[in-house]
C-alpha cells in the first residue's frame, strides 16, 4: 500500500523552474519528443470506436485509451503497469499520457514555417536579404533560385524564371546549381556563415552614411546576432519533421446518431498526412516533375494552414463554410489559450445569486443563503460529521447532507463561523471589486450586501448579481481576513479618501436630523446632555430641529495619547445632540454641529480615520448608517408634484429672450451678422435665459418665510423635500431640479451640435409633441454612448494594466536626490488643487526651507502626512520638491520612498505592493464616468478664447515671472517676452491666481504692486500681434519698396493710410529676395544697439504686417512699430474625455503639433521654398546652426533676431509629448502628461492621485535608444530597457571604461506593453504571433519577473504575500541549496503574512 501511495505522489510532482526559454526546434529535437511516426490519416474505427493503428489517434504511439489497460485487452489492472503488450504494442499506463505524448510526421519534402516567412518583418527574408515576394515565388514553385553560381555569371540568390533556367541550363550545363521550393531556401539558409556575414555587415555599417541603409543593416545585424547567440540554426525555420499534437488536446467525441464532433486540427493534420503520403508515392514512382511540383506546393499549403490558417491566401474552410481553427488561432485572441484559460479560469467552490439590501448587517458581514452555504461548504461539513462520529464514512455524510438533517444545519453554523467568503461583482474594475466578509446564514435565496460597500462595488439592488468564492486553505483564509476584509478597505486606493461613505437615504436621514428650524417645538430649552435630548424628543416634547442648549462633553488626546474631557454648553439642535451619542471619543463637537451633507459626512469619517484609526471608524460608519436609515424613515421626505415650484419670473425671462432672438434674426436678414454669428448669439441668449430661470427657481426653492418666536417673519432654509435631497447630496442636482421646475433648456443633436430652439417647458408643465421629439434625441444618444464608453474604458484599463503589471515596490530607499517640483494647480483665477492635496503622502526630495529664510522647515526624506502639510500651509510654502516614481533609481521596480504613502492604508508603502496594477485600476476604473465626446467650441466659449485683458479676482500683490519688458512713453510696462506668467500673491505669500500674459501686453500695474480685487492689470489687442521696439530713435525703412515688397492701403472709413507688407508669394521677382525691415537709428543716422547686446535694433517684418508709421518718424521704446493680424482660431475641436486620456497614454502626436526650438540661439529666416519658410537657429557659441522647414500657414511666435531657449515654442499648437521629452527632459513630459490627464478627470469631478499617472509614465519611459555604444555591447540606434543600460553603465564605470550614452524614449502604452522584456506577457496581450516569432528566433529567456507571466505559468505572483516567498526562493538559490519541499508550508505562509501585516498595521499610528 505504501508503494502505491509513493507512486501516486510521484505522479503529481511539480517542476521548480526560474525561467522559460523559447527557441526554434531542430528536427532531431522534434523526433526526440515524439513517441512514434503518424503514417495514416485514419482516426478511429467508426464501428468499434477503437483508434486505428499508426493513425492520428493511435494507441501505440500516444498511449492507452483506458487507464492501465492495453488496446486488445490482454493486460489489465495496475499490476501490469509499464508492460508493453506484444500483440497490440500499447504500453500499460495511465490514459492521461495521451495529453502529453507527441507524435511526428516525416515530411517527404521540406516546407517553410509560415510564421517565419509571413509574420512581418519576414525573418527568412531578412536573413537571406531577399524580398518576401521572391522567396514566396520560390517556395510555391513559380521560379528557381540560384544556390551555387560556380564559374558562371549567375549570382547566388538570383531568381530565375522557368525560361531563364532552361536557357542557363543550355548555356552552362551543370556548372551551376539552381532549385525551387523549400529545399532551395533550406539549402541557402544552410550554406550561410552567420558570423562571417555579421562581420561584413558591421564593416559596411561603419562605412555607410545613409540613414535608411543604417537602419536596415542594424536590423539584419541584430537578427544574425540573435541566431548566433541563441544557437538556433537558420535552416530550422524550414520544417522537415512536423510534430503532432497529443490526441487528447484535439479530441474526437462521438455524438449520438453515429456522428462525431472533432477538433479542427484533426482535419488539418489529415490533410497534411494525405498529401505527404501521396507525395511519397509520386516520388517512388518517379512521376513527372510538374505533378510532383504541384503535390509539393499543396503539401506546403497544407502545413501553412495547420500552423496558421488564413495567413497566406484564403483560409481553408470546413464543411460548414467557416475557416478551420489552426494552431495559431488556438493561442491568440480573447478566446485563445492565454486569455481564456491561463489568465482567467473558472473557479470551484463558488456560486452566484442576486443581491439585496442587508441594512442590519455589520460592515464585515454579508448574508449568505443557507442553501448556497450548504453547497459551498460541503467538504468541510463532511469532514466535521466524520470527525464527530455522526457519520461513519464520507458516503454516509453525503447522504445526511442530501437529506438535510437537523444536525447538518448545526454543523454548518460551526463551519461557517469565522470562515470568511469573498464576494465579487463583475465588472471588477479595481481591487475593491472583490472583498471578504463573514457570512451570516439567512433564509431565502438572495445574498444580502451591506449598503456601505455598494459604492466600492458600484452595486445597486435593481437585479445585480454577485459571485461568492470560498477561500479553502488556512493561508487563503488568513489573507482574506487580514487583507481583503471589507473593514480593512475603508480608503480608496485611487485617492486616499474614504470609500465607505454613506449615500442616498443615509445622507438624507443625517441631513434631516442635523437641520435647524426657526420656532420649532421646544426651542430655547437647556438640556443636561444628549441622553436628555433623546428622551424629550421621544416623549414628543421637542422637535428634532429645535434650537436648544445642550451640555456636551468632548474628548481630546493629550501628548501621551490619553483622552482629556472638556465639558461646555453648546448652542445646537436636538437632532445634533442625539447624533453626538454615536460619534467616537476624540472628535470635536463642531464636526456634527452643522447641517450634514454628503461632503461633510465624508470629511467626518476621514477625520475619524486619521485621528482614531481603523476600528472606531468602522464602528462609527456602521452607526451612522443605522441612524441615517432610522431618521430618513422618520423624516417622511417624499416627492409630490407641488414640491416643484415654478418661479413666477419664468414667463417674463422667456419672453425677453424671445424678443432678443427676434432682433438678432432681423439683423441677420439685413445682412449685419453672418449665419454663424447669429447661431452662436441665439445659443448664448438661450443659455443665459436658462441660467436666469434656474437661478430664480433655486432662490424660490431654497428659502421659505416663517414666523419666529417674536411673531416676526424670518427667512430660513427650506424644508422642501426635493430641495433637501439635492442640498444634502443624497440624490439629484440643481440641473435636474431645473428640468423639473425651470425649463429643460437647449438640447443637442446626435452629432453633438446644439439645436437652437430650446425646450422652454419643464416636466411639471409637460412637453408638447415637438419638444418631446427633440428630447428623444438626447436620451437615445445617451444610451448609445454608454455602451460605447464601457467597451472603450475596459480596453483602456486592459492596456494600462498590461503596461504596468510588473511594477512592484522592491526596495526601501534608492537614495536618489531627484524629484518633481510640486506647485498648486491654478487655472486662471482659481486654485483648482491646493498644494497640500498634491504633496500629501509624498516624500520630500530636498529640505523644505521656510520661505525667505534658510531655516529648514521639513527635512529631506520626510513622509508628508497631515500635520506636516498643515505646517507647510501655515508657513505658506508654495512649491515643494517631492520624490517621484519617475525619477526612482531602482532597477526593475520602485523604492518605497519614491512612491510615498500607500493611499489605501495611510502609511508608507510596503515592499511587494503591486503599485503598477493599483495605478492602472485607479485610472481605468473611473473611465466609464468620463465623456466620449469631442467638444465643439462655439458660442460663448469661442469668444472667451479671444481674451483681451486680465482682471484679478482677489486683492494681493502681482508677481511676474519669465519677464522681459520695456517702459513706453506713457510710463507703462510693455511685455516683450513670450511666456510671461503673472501670479497674484495674497498677504500670506500664497499664490491665488495665475495667468499667461501675451507678447505686447500693456501692464496697468508693475511687478510687486498691490492690486484690489476686480482690477484690470493688463490689456492687449487679441486680434493682432504687435512688433514692439525696445529702443528709442528714428525709423528707417529698409527693403520697403512700394509695389515690390509693400503696398499702400487706405481705410475707407477713416481715410488713414497704412503700409502692408506683401507675402513672398504676392511679390514680383525683384522683391522675392528682399527682406523688409524697420531699423531704428539715432539723430545722426547711426544704428541704435539693443540694450545688453551688440546687435543693431532691426525688426524684420513678416508678410501681411501693417505699418502705420512713415519713414523717419521719431519713436520711443515700447511703441508699436507694426501689427501682424492674427487669424482668429476658428472653431477648433477639443478632444475631451476618454479619447483624450487614451491619446495621452498612447503618446500620440497631435495633428498640427507646436513647433519647439531644437537648440538655443538666435532666430533668422533663410531662403524660402514654395510653401515653406526656412527657420534657422544660430547658437550663440558659434557652433553649427540648426535649420527647419516650417509651412507658411503656421503662425510664428518669434521675430527675426530674437533669442530662443531650447524647447521654447516657435509656433503654437498642442505640444507633442515626444518633443517635450527630447527638448525639456523627463520631468517636463511627466508634468505635461500628469496635468493633462488630471484636467480631463477633474472636469468630471473624479479625484485620482498624481502618483498613479506617474507610475504609468515611468512605464512609458522604460526604453532608451543608444546614441553611442562606448565600451558596451549595445548597438548604436538600438532600443533597450532603460534599467539594462543603467546596470551596464554602472559596471563599465566601475571598471573605468566608457559607458554608453542614450536618450530616453517615450512609448505609448500599447507599444510599451509589447516591448516588455517578458515575451509571455507581451504574447498574452496583443499580436501573439509576432511576439512569439520574434522571441523564438532570438531564443529569448523569460525571467518571469512580472505578475502576468507568473499567473500564466501558475505560480504565486512576486507581489503581496507572494513577494516574501519569491525573495526566499532567490535567497535559497543564491545559497545554492535546493529547498527540500518545493511547496510553501502553512507555517511559512502564515509567518510571512504576519510579518507583512505587522508592517502594514503597525505603521498606522506613528506615520
From Swiss-Prot:
Chain segments annotated as coiled-coil in the UniProt record: none
Reactions the enzyme catalyzes: RNA(n) + a ribonucleoside 5'-triphosphate = RNA(n+1) + diphosphate
Record-level GO BP terms: DNA-templated transcription
Amino acids binding Mg(2+): 460, 462, 464
A cellular-component GO term for this protein: DNA-directed RNA polymerase complex
EC id: 2.7.7.6
Top-level division of the source organism's lineage: Bacteria
Positions of Zn(2+) 2 binding: 814, 888, 895, 898
SMART domains, alphabetized: RPOLA_N
Cofactor note: Binds 1 Mg(2+) ion per subunit.
Cofactor: Mg(2+); Zn(2+)
UniProt cross-references to PANTHER family, sorted A to Z: DNA-DIRECTED RNA POLYMERASE, DNA-DIRECTED RNA POLYMERASE SUBUNIT BETA
Function, in words: DNA-dependent RNA polymerase catalyzes the transcription of DNA into RNA using the four ribonucleoside triphosphates as substrates. Chromosomal supercoiling density is controlled by a combination of RNA polymerase and DNA gyrase activity; negative supercoiling increases upstream of transcribed regions while it decreases downstream, DNA gyrase introduces negative supercoils into underwound DNA.
Subunit structure: The RNAP catalytic core consists of 2 alpha, 1 beta, 1 beta' and 1 omega subunit. When a sigma factor is associated with the core the holoenzyme is formed, which can initiate transcription.
HAMAP family: RNApol_bact_RpoC
Homology family: Belongs to the RNA polymerase beta' chain family.
Name listed for the protein in its UniProt record: DNA-directed RNA polymerase subunit beta'
Gene: rpoC
Amino acid at each position: 500500500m505504501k508503494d502505491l501511495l509513493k507512486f501516486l505522489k510521484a505522479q503529481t510532482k511539480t517542476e521548480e523552474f526560474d525561467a522559460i526559454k523559447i527557441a526554434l526546434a531542430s528536427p532531431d529535437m522534434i523526433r526526440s519528443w515524439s513517441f512514434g511516426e503518424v503514417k495514416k490519416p485514419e482516426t478511429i474505427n467508426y464501428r468499434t470506436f477503437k483508434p486505428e493503428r499508426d493513425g492520428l489517434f493511435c494507441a501505440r504511439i500516444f498511449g492507452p485509451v483506458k487507464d492501465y489497460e492495453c488496446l486488445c485487452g490482454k493486460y489489465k489492472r495496475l499490476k501490469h503497469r509499464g508492460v508493453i503488450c506484444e500483440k497490440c504494442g500499447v504500453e500499460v499506463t495511465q490514459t492521461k499520457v495521451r495529453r502529453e505524448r507527441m507524435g511526428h510526421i516525416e515530411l517527404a519534402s521540406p516546407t517553410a514555417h509560415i510564421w517565419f516567412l509571413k509574420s512581418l518583418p519576414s525573418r527568412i527574408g531578412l536573413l537571406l536579404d531577399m524580398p518576401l515576394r521572391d522567396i514566396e515565388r520560390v517556395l510555391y514553385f513559380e521560379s528557381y533560385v540560384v544556390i551555387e553560381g560556380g564559374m558562371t555569371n549567375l549570382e547566388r540568390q538570383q531568381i530565375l524564371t522557368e525560361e531563364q533556367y532552361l536557357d542557363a541550363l543550355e548555356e552552362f550545363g551543370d556548372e551551376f546549381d539552381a532549385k525551387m521550393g523549400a529545399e532551395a531556401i533550406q539549402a541557402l539558409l544552410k550554406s550561410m556563415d552567420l558570423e562571417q556575414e555579421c562581420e561584413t555587415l558591421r564593416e559596411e555599417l561603419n562605412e555607410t552614411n545613409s540613414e535608411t541603409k543604417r537602419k536596415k543593416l542594424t536590423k539584419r545585424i541584430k537578427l544574425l546576432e540573435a541566431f548566433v547567440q541563441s544557437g538556433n540554426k537558420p535552416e530550422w525555420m524550414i520544417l522537415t519533421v512536423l510534430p503532432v499534437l497529443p490526441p487528447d488536446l484535439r479530441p474526437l467525441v462521438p455524438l449520438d446518431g453515429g456522428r462525431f464532433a472533432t477538433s479542427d486540427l484533426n482535419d488539418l493534420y489529415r490533410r497534411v498526412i494525405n498529401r505527404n503520403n501521396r507525395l511519397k508515392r509520386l516520388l517512388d514512382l518517379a512521376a513527372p516533375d510538374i505533378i510532383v511540383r504541384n503535390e509539393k506546393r499543396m503539401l506546403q499549403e497544407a502545413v501553412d494552414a495547420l500552423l496558421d490558417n488564413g495567413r497566406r491566401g484564403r483560409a481553408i474552410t470546413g464543411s460548414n463554410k467557416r475557416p478551420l481553427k489552426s494552431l495559431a488561432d488556438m493561442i491568440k485572441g480573447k478566446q485563445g489559450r492565454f486569455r481564456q484559460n491561463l489568465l482567467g479560469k473558472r473557479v470551484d467552490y463558488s456560486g452566484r445569486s442576486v443581491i439585496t439590501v442587508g441594512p442590519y448587517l455589520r460592515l464585515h458581514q454579508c448574508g449568505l443563503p443557507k442553501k448556497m452555504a450548504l453547497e459551498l461548504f460541503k467538504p468541510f461539513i463532511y469532514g466535521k460529521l466524520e470527525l464527530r462520529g455522526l457519520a461513519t464514512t464520507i458516503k454516509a455524510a453525503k447522504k445526511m447532507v442530501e437529506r438535510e438533517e437537523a444536525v447538518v444545519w448545526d454543523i454548518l453554523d460551526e463551519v461557517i463561523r469565522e470562515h470568511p467568503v469573498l464576494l465579487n461583482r463583475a465588472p471588477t474594475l479595481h481591487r475593491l471589486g472583490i472583498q471578504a466578509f463573514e457570512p451570516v446564514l439567512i433564509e431565502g435565496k438572495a445574498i444580502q450586501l451591506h449598503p456601505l460597500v455598494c459604492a466600492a462595488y458600484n452595486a445597486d439592488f435593481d437585479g445585480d448579481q454577485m459571485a461568492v468564492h470560498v477561500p479553502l486553505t488556512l493561508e487563503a483564509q488568513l489573507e482574506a481576513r487580514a487583507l481583503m476584509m471589507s473593514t480593512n478597505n475603508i480608503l480608496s486606493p485611487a485617492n486616499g479618501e474614504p470609500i465607505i461613505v454613506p449615500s442616498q437615504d443615509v445622507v438624507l436621514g443625517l441631513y434631516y436630523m442635523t437641520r435647524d428650524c426657526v420656532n420649532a417645538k421646544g426651542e430655547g430649552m437647556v438640556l443636561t446632555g444628549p441622553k436628555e435630548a433623546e428622551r424629550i424628543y421621544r416623549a414628543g416634547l421637542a422637535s428634532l430641529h429645535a434650537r436648544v442648549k445642550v451640555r456636551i462633553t468632548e474628548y481630546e488626546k493629550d501628548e501621551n495619547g490619553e483622552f482629556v474631557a472638556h465639558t461646555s454648553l453648546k448652542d445646537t439642535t436636538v437632532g445634533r445632540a442625539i447624533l453626538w451619542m454615536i460619534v467616537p471619543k476624540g472628535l470635536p463637537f463642531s464636526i456634527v454641529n452643522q447641517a450634514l451633507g454628503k461632503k461633510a459626512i465624508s470629511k467626518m469619517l476621514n477625520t475619524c480615520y486619521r485621528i482614531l484609526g481603523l476600528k472606531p471608524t468602522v464602528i462609527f460608519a456602521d452607526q451612522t448608517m443605522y441612524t441615517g436609515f432610522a431618521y430618513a424613515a422618520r423624516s417622511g421626505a417624499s416627492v409630490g408634484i407641488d414640491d416643484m415650484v415654478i418661479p413666477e419670473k419664468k414667463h417674463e425671462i422667456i419672453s425677453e429672450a424671445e424678443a432678443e432672438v427676434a432682433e438678432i434674426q432681423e439683423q441677420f436678414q439685413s445682412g449685419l451678422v453672418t449665419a454663424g454669428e447669429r447661431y452662436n448669439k441665439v445659443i448664448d441668449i438661450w443659455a443665459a435665459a436658462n441660467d436666469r430661470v434656474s437661478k430664480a427657481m433655486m432662490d424660490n426653492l431654497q428659502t421659505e418665510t416663517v414666523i419666529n418666536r417674536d411673531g416676526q417673519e424670518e427667512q430660513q432654509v427650506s424644508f422642501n423635500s426635493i430641495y433637501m435631497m439635492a442640498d444634502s447630496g443624497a440624490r439629484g442636482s440643481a440641473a435636474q431640479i431645473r428640468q423639473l421646475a425651470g425649463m429643460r433648456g437647449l438640447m443637442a443633436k446626435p452629432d453633438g451640435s446644439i439645436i437652437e430652439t430650446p425646450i422652454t417647458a419643464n416636466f411639471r408643465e409637460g412637453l408638447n409633441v415637438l419638444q418631446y421629439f427633440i428630447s428623444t434625441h438626447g436620451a437615445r444618444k445617451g444610451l448609445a454612448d454608454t455602451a460605447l464608453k464601457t467597451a472603450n474604458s475596459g480596453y483602456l484599463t486592459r492596456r494600462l494594466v498590461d503596461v504596468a503589471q510588473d511594477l512592484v515596490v522592491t526596495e526601501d530607499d534608492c537614495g536618489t536626490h531627484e524629484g518633481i517640483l510640486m506647485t498648486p494647480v491654478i487655472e486662471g483665477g482659481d486654485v483648482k488643487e491646493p498644494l497640500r492635496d498634491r504633496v500629501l503622502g509624498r516624500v520630500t526630495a530636498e529640505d523644505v526651507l521656510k520661505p525667505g529664510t534658510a531655516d529648514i522647515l521639513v527635512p529631506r526624506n520626510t513622509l508628508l502626512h497631515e500635520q506636516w502639510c498643515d505646517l507647510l500651509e501655515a508657513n505658506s510654502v508654495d512649491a515643494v520638491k517631492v520624490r517621484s516614481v519617475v525619477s526612482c533609481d531602482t532597477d526593475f521596480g520602485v523604492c518605497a520612498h519614491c512612491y510615498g504613502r500607500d493611499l489605501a492604508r495611510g502609511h508608507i508603502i510596503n515592499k511587494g505592493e503591486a503599485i503598477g496594477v493599483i495605478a492602472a485600476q485607479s485610472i481605468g476604473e473611473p473611465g466609464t464616468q468620463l465623456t466620449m465626446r469631442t467638444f465643439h467650441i462655439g458660442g460663448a466659449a469661442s469668444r472667451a478664447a479671444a481674451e483681451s485683458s486680465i482682471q484679478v479676482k482677489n486683492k494681493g500683490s502681482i508677481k511676474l515671472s519669465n519677464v522681459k519688458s520695456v517702459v513706453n512713453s506713457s510710463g507703462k510696462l510693455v511685455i516683450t517676452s513670450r511666456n510671461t506668467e503673472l501670479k497674484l500673491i495674497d498677504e500670506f505669500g500664497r499664490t491665488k491666481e495665475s495667468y499667461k500674459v501675451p507678447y505686447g501686453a500693456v501692464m496697468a500695474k508693475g511687478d510687486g504692486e498691490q492690486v484690489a480685487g476686480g482690477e484690470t492689470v493688463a490689456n492687449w489687442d487679441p486680434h493682432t500681434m504687435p512688433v514692439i521696439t525696445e529702443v528709442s530713435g528714428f525709423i528707417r525703412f529698409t527693403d520697403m519698396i512700394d509695389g515690390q515688397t509693400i503696398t499702400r492701403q487706405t481705410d475707407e472709413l477713416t481715410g488713414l493710410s497704412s503700409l502692408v507688407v506683401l507675402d513672398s508669394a504676392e511679390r514680383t521677382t525683384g522683391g522675392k529676395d528682399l527682406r523688409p525691415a524697420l531699423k531704428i537709428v539715432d539723430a545722426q543716422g547711426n544704428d541704435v544697439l539693443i540694450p545688453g547686446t551688440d546687435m543693431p535694433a532691426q525688426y524684420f517684418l513678416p508678410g501681411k504686417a501693417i505699418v502705420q508709421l512713415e519713414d523717419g518718424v521719431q519713436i520711443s521704446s515700447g511703441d508699436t512699430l507694426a501689427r501682424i493680424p492674427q487669424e482668429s482660431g476658428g472653431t477648433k475641436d477639443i478632444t475631451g474625455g476618454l479619447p483624450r486620456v487614451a491619446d495621452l497614454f498612447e503618446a500620440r502626436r497631435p495633428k498640427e503639433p507646436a513647433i519647439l526650438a531644437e537648440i538655443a540661439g538666435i532666430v533668422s529666416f533663410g531662403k524660402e521654398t514654395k510653401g515653406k519658410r526656412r527657420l534657422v537657429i544660430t547658437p550663440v557659441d558659434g557652433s553649427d546652426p540648426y535649420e527647419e522647414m516650417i509651412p507658411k500657414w503656421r503662425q510664428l511666435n518669434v521675430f527675426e533676431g530674437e533669442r530662443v531657449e531650447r524647447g521654447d515654442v516657435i509656433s503654437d499648437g498642442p505640444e507633442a509629448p515626444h518633443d517635450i521629452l527630447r527638448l525639456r527632459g523627463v520631468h517636463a513630459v511627466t508634468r505635461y502628461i500628469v496635468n493633462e490627464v488630471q484636467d480631463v478627470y477633474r472636469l468630471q469631478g473624479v479625484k485620482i492621485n498624481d502618483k498613479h499617472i506617474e507610475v504609468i509614465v515611468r512605464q512609458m519611459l522604460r526604453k532608451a535608444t543608444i546614441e553611442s555604444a562606448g565600451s558596451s555591447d549595445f548597438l548604436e540606434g538600438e532600443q533597450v530597457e532603460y534599467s539594462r543600460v543603467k546596470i551596464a553603465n554602472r559596471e563599465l564605470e566601475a571598471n573605468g571604461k566608457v559607458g554608453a550614452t542614450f536618450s530616453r524614449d517615450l512609448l505609448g502604452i500599447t507599444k510599451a506593453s509589447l516591448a516588455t522584456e517578458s515575451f509571455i506577457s507581451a504574447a498574452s496581450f496583443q499580436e501573439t504571433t509576432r511576439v512569439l516569432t520574434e522571441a523564438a528566433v532570438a531564443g529569448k529567456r523569460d525571467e518571469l519577473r512580472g505578475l502576468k507571466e507568473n499567473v500564466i505559468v501558475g505560480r504565486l505572483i512576486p507581489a503581496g504575500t507572494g513577494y516574501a516567498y519569491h525573495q526566499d526562493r532567490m535567497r535559497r538559490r543564491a545559497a545554492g541549496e535546493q529547498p527540500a519541499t518545493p511547496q510553501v508550508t502553512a507555517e511559512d505562509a502564515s509567518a510571512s503574512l504576519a510579518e507583512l501585516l505587522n508592517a502594514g498595521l503597525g505603521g498606522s499610528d506613528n506615520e
